């Protein structure tokens, strides 16, 4: 069976379209779309279960927290969703906190791929799973080799200096 992804976020968002649709299709995968126009975590989890989705694409805490709450609620009702086919949660666009990641990982045995990017390409990634989730690493990304930070006057910012600058990325 080809990989199956579900972009939970709007397709007008780069995360939804690029990560949720274009990349899975370019890899020969299947894309499942939600039927509703608003975010309903229980409806989303039902769709994941029915379609045997392997990867879900979200936008940080605003999706992860309600999903974790719905997963916990279903478990408390003794009617847990079957998430056994899920392998990855892919997120970009807003903060994806360690607490939200941990909450999801209590219910999903997945890899969480949290990326920082733009139209020009990926600038950094953070990868977590049940064995590696670490409170101190949320919001810290492994930068891509071509990513740099420069001050307004064009000076390169030394990584870890705390100095604020503009993120620049070379190539995709």
Where are the language model's segments positioned?
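Gly/Ser/Thr-rich phosphate-binding loop
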Residues: 26-29, 54-55, 68-136, 141-142, ...
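Conserved AMP-binding/adenylation subdomain of ANL enzymes
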Residues: 1-7, 12-57, 69-70, 74
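Extended hydrophobic secondary-structure segments that form protein cores and membrane-embedded regions
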Residues: 4-7, 87-91, 167
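AMP-binding/adenylate-forming core of the ANL superfamily
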Residues: 160-172
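Active-site lining segments that contact anionic ligands and/or coordinate catalytic metals
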Residues: 2, 86, 144, 164-165
């Amino acid at each position: 069976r080809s990989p199956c992804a579900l972009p939970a976020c709007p397709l007008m968002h780069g995360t939804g379209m690029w990560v949720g649709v274009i990349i899975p299709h370019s890899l020969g995968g299947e894309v499942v779309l939600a039927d509703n126009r608003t975010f309903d975590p229980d409806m989303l989890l039902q769709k994941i279960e029915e379609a045997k989705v392997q990867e879900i694409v979200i936008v940080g805490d605003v999706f992860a927290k309600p999903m974790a709450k719905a997963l916990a609620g279903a478990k408390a009702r003794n009617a847990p969703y079957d998430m056994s086919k899920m392998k990855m949660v892919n997120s970009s666009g807003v903060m994806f906190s360690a607490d939200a990641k941990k909450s999801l990982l209590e219910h999903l045995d997945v890899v969480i791929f949290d990326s920082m990017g733009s139209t020009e390409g990926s600038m950094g990634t953070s990868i977590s799973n049940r064995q590696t989730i670490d409170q101190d690493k949320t919001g810290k990304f492994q930068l891509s080799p071509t990513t740099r930070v420069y001050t307004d006057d064009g000076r390169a910012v030394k990584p870890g200096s705390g100095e604020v600058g503009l993120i620049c990325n070379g190539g995709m």
